[in-house]
Swiss-Prot record:
Residues 258-272, 333-343 have a biased composition (Low complexity). Residues 236-246, 440-453 have a biased composition (Basic and acidic residues). Residues 475-488 have a biased composition (Gly residues). It is found in: Cytoplasm; Nucleus. This is COP9 signalosome complex subunit 6. One of its GO terms (biological process) is protein deneddylation. InterPro entries: JAMM/MPN+_dom, MPN, MPN_CSN6. It comes from Neurospora crassa (strain ATCC 24698 / 74-OR23-1A / CBS 708.71 / DSM 1257 / FGSC 987). Residues 21-162 form the MPN domain. One of its GO terms (molecular function) is metallopeptidase activity. Its main location: cytoplasm. Residues 230-282, 324-350, 435-497 are annotated as: Disordered. Belongs to the peptidase M67A family. CSN6 subfamily.
């Protein structure tokens, strides 16, 4: 029997590094999204990315990741060093509050472990960080998932181990001649990988993101809703699938069942098949519309699940023995009559469910609490139109009151903002006026302050003393007839004289 194939890059020694790796869910989402987008776009290159986190001694946390640009050189790929350095600096700047740094890289790895194609890239990352780990995604486990299996990934550490050439032989024959080696020669070393155990940690922000993914975001819109619509058949619970097909008769289309479409498929000509194109009707929808469709789909699924649960409860109650039903109930009397009729006719008695008091109490509590979760307008069947209108009016008043409260809060916020702006304007006005007053006081203290203005009626621009102005006026009045001049110019001339 042939020996099992052993990966030569996997170390046979146990790990003595005692590394403890904590994996966060956000890198897993980013890596899976990158793989999905690459597959849908038909990407033919290498799927390689970097892992950033914290490394405290022997403890490593993997918190974020980003894709890495690679170049194809012959048979292998290599990392664009300049691009990687620039992108790593950007990621460090974004997460500088957490002091995140490069701790490893990820790629697609077979279940048996890394291959020779991974060594050039790992050697580059090993030069950046000797403790860099390799997160290998197993694509085959992603394509063929099995319930209960762990995450389709493995984390490896790398070490330089001495290779003496005997590891290539997996079976050692007793008594076989072996080559003598020079013990003084320096032994060769090669990179070997070892599997590392890891734990998962989740932060508060990551829990919010996972909750959004679990509930179904805008990217979770079902693809079957674009061309296929499901309608419930009245006679059975199986949905009838209908598909919009082109009948090649003008521009009209009609909805036919899947069986009819399969029957009509052979009659379609090859030319029509070549020219027919399936257009996605959701291609031009906005994000808000996609979110609305996703919310409607989630509500539809919830209603369907509730309907199935109610059908199960009704079926359970219908299969209870007649003695567990009230004697005054019409349905119980009808069941007793049917049972007596079957006994007289010799027919087989129906199989009743084993009653459970716990289940019956839960059903009773559910029926009792129905009135608490339903509105008054839908709780009773005998309400008149006036009462329903009253309930609707009360609801509209409540909505109007809440709307007014919200708008009032907004107006108060705007008013407070305006008051704050007015206070700032008042402070600036006070500073300007204070500066002007101080300047005027300085000019007055220097005896006029301004230069001589020939167009001003008094020298000094009105900044001089009152006695000088009175003297100038007296001189002007006493010599008005002798000077032959009048007005401000004459006054100035007489004052100069």
């Amino acid at each position: 029997m042939a020996a099992a194939t052993v990966n030569p890059l996997m170390s046979t020694l146990k790990s003595d590094s005692s590394l403890q790796v904590a994996l966060h869910p956000l890198p897993i989402l980013e890596i899976s999204d990158y793989i999905t987008r690459s597959y849908l776009r038909g990407y033919k290159g290498a799927i390689v990315g970097a892992l950033i986190g914290q490394q405290n001694g022997r403890q490593i946390t993997i918190e974020h990741s980003f894709s890495v640009k690679t170049e194809h050189t012959g048979q292998n790929y290599k990392v664009d060093s300049e691009w990687f350095t620039a992108r790593l600096d950007q990621m460090k700047a974004v997460h500088k509050d957490r002091a995140l740094d490069f701790v490893g890289w990820y790629t697609l790895v077979p279940k048996s472990g890394p291959t020779d194609a991974h060594l050039p890239i790992h050697s580059y990352f090993y030069s950046q960080n000797e403790s860099a780990v390799l997160l290998g995604f197993h694509i085959h486990e992603i394509l063929n998932p099995v319930a209960g299996d762990p995450l389709p990934l493995t984390i490896y550490e790398s070490n330089l181990e001495i290779v003496d050439g005997t590891e290539a032989s997996t079976v050692e024959v007793e008594g076989e001649d072996r080559e003598m080696k020079d013990v003084t020669a320096e032994p060769s070393r090669s990179i070997k990988f070892r599997e590392l155990p890891y734990t998962t940690e989740t932060g508060e922000a990551e829990m919010i993101a996972l909750e959004f993914v679990r509930e179904g975001g805008s990217a979770n819109v079902t693809t079957t809703a674009t061309n296929i619509t499901a309608t419930e058949d009245e006679g059975s619970d199986k949905p009838l699938m209908k598909k919009v097909v082109d009948t090649n008769k003008g521009s009209k289309r009609r909805a036919v069942s899947s069986d009819d479409a399969a029957a009509e498929a052979p009659t379609t000509s090859s030319a029509a098949k070549g020219t027919a194109t399936d257009k996605n009707r959701d291609a031009n929808l906005t994000k808000a519309e996609l979110d609305y469709m996703s919310a409607l789909q989630a509500k539809y699924n919830a209603v369907q699940m509730m309907k199935k649960r109610l059908d199960t409860v009704i079926s359970y109650l219908q299969r209870l023995p007649p003695d567990y039903l009230s004697s005054g109930d019409a349905s119980s009397q009808q069941q007793q009559q049917q049972q007596q009729q079957q006994q007289t006719e010799g027919l087989d008695q129906p199989q009743y469910t084993v009653p459970s008091n716990k289940i019956l109490r839960q059903i009773q509590a559910l029926v009792t609490n129905v009135q608490l979760v339903m509105s008054n307008s839908t709780s009773g069947q005998g309400q008149g139109q006036g009462e329903r209108d009253t309930d609707l009016g009360a609801l509209e008043k409540e909505l109007l009151k809440e709307t007014n409260d919200v708008k009032l809060v907004e107006l108060i916020a705007d008013l407070m903002s305006s008051v704050k702006d007015m206070k700032e304007v008042g402070k600036k006005f006070h500073v300007v006026e204070t500066a002007k007053n101080s300047k005027r006081r300085e000019q007055a203290s220097h005896g006029g302050g301004e230069r001589f203005n020939p167009h001003h009626p008094y020298p000094g621009g009105g900044g001089g003393s009152s006695m000088m102005r009175e003297h100038a006026g007296l001189v002007g009045e006493g010599s008005a007839s002798g000077s032959g001049g009048s007005g401000p110019a004459g006054d100035l001339a007489r004052f100069d004289h």
